[in-house]
Amino acid sequence: MASVLANLASWRLVLLFVAACHHAAPPQHAANVYRGYASWYGEAQMTASGERFNPHALTAAHRTLPLGTRVRVTNTRNGRSVIVRINDRGPYGKGRIIDLSEAAAKQLDMIDAGVAPVTLEVVR
């Protein structure tokens, strides 16, 4: 009986430790950080937000983020970043998570490559 109680006490300690680890909170922004590939587009058209596309504005297209969301895009090849406003829907190319305006792509130094690995962080 004493060994059963000792075993039970040991398991309680293990469960307490596991529970304490489980409740450790991840960084608050972890759910708002995405990794993938960015591309850019420059043709004139209407955007999903109803505004005319402006290749000189710091804007972008994303499939699911609410229109108006501001996102920090970082080119992981060179560390350059830019904050863009989501005003359109897309991209529709395989493996891409954001389509940038020409101005945003220039700031990330990805015009010639056309596609770059990026991280996205929602800033508001």
Regions found by a protein language model. Name each.
Residues 1-13:
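Short, low-complexity, charge-dense intrinsically disordered segments
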Residues 2, 17, 21-124:
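Secreted/periplasmic proteins
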